[in-house]
């Protein structure tokens, strides 16, 4: 691929912008300065600009630690979109592989690979999602069994699929809940059906992808290849 085309795709730059960047002498390919846009980037070649490696053009897979009060959409009339937390080119090409409510925190996956995100969000694939939940009222002894059997939700014809509930801290009304569906406000509705209320909700895991504990709310990083591939397993 031509160097100017590589930079256009990787940085979201125009051809004119890419040419200017190249002529600045700050672009290196495999450690050597290249000042021609027609230079062919070899397969597996490492491109650097301004001292930083420029990722090869291709699908993007991002893990975001979503804070509260951000929405998982491109536009909203009341709250800021979580996309403003990304310092990335062509954000308009990205989408969420499963959303979180505005007041829910934790793991959100963002990509421009529609097939990959479909694997996560399609009900037929039963992708597991794990949430840490803090409840308003005491955890009842029969909760674990009831979640394992499925919960009857209001205005739903069928009960939820079996879910796994783990009691983490009974004194703090803290549990871990793993579900394989993505119904509207599902976690909150499941506990409401049992007469309880979710006070705080935090997603920790999607499939085999776990929220990086080095990230702070609002931080993000690219997924490793192993994390990307885990979705297909």
UniProtKB/Swiss-Prot annotation:
Enzyme type, top EC level: isomerase
Gene Ontology biological process terms in this record: enzyme-directed rRNA pseudouridine synthesis
Domain S4 RNA-binding residue range list: 1-67
Organism for this UniProt entry: Vibrio parahaemolyticus serotype O3:K6 (strain RIMD 2210633)
Protein name: Ribosomal small subunit pseudouridine synthase A
Database matches in InterPro entries: PsdUridine_s_RsuA/RluB/E/F_cat, PsdUridine_synth_cat_dom_sf, PsdUridine_synth_RsuA/RluA, PsdUridine_synth_RsuA/RluB/E/F, PsdUridine_synth_RsuA/RluB_CS, RsuA_PseudoU_synthase, S4_RNA-bd, S4_RNA-bd_sf
Keywords: Isomerase, RNA-binding, rRNA processing
Family listed: Belongs to the pseudouridine synthase RsuA family.
Annotated catalytic residues: 101
Gene Ontology molecular function, alphabetical: 16S rRNA pseudouridine(516) synthase activity; RNA binding
Signal sequence interval, chain numbering: none
Alphabetical list of SMART domains matching this protein: S4
Disulfide bonds: none
Catalytic reaction annotation: uridine(516) in 16S rRNA = pseudouridine(516) in 16S rRNA
EC number(s) given by UniProt: 5.4.99.19
Function: Responsible for synthesis of pseudouridine from uracil-516 in 16S ribosomal RNA.
Lineage of the organism: Bacteria, Pseudomonadati, Pseudomonadota, Gammaproteobacteria, Vibrionales
Domain of life (superkingdom): Bacteria
């Amino acid at each position: 691929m031509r160097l100017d085309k590589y930079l256009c795709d990787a940085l979201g730059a125009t051809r004119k912008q890419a040419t200017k960047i190249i002529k600045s002498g700050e672009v290196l390919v495999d450690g050597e300065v290249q000042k021609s846009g027609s230079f062919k980037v070899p397969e597996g070649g490492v491109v650097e600009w301004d001292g930083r490696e420029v990722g090869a053009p291709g699908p993007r897979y991002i893990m975001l630690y979503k804070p509260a009060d951000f929405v998982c959409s491109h536009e909203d009339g009341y709250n800021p979109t979580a996309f403003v937390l990304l310092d990335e080119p062509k954000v308009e090409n990205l989408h969420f592989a499963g959303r979180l409510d505005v007041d829910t925190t934790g793991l959100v996956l963002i990509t421009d690979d529609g097939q990959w995100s479909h694997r996560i969000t399609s009900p037929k694939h039963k992708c597991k999602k794990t949430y840490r939940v803090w409840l308003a009222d005491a955890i009842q002894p029969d909760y674990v069994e009831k979640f394992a059997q499925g919960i009857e939700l209001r205005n739903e014809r069928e009960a939820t699929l079996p879910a796994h509930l783990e009691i983490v801290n009974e004194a703090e009304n803290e549990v871990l809940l793993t579900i394989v569906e993505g119904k509207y406000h599902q976690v909150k509705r499941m506990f409401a059906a049992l007469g309880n209320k979710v006070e705080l909700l935090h997603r920790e895991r999607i499939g085999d992808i776990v929220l990086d504990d080095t990230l702070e709310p609002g931080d993000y990083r690219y997924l490793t290849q192993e994390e990307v591939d885990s979705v297909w397993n």
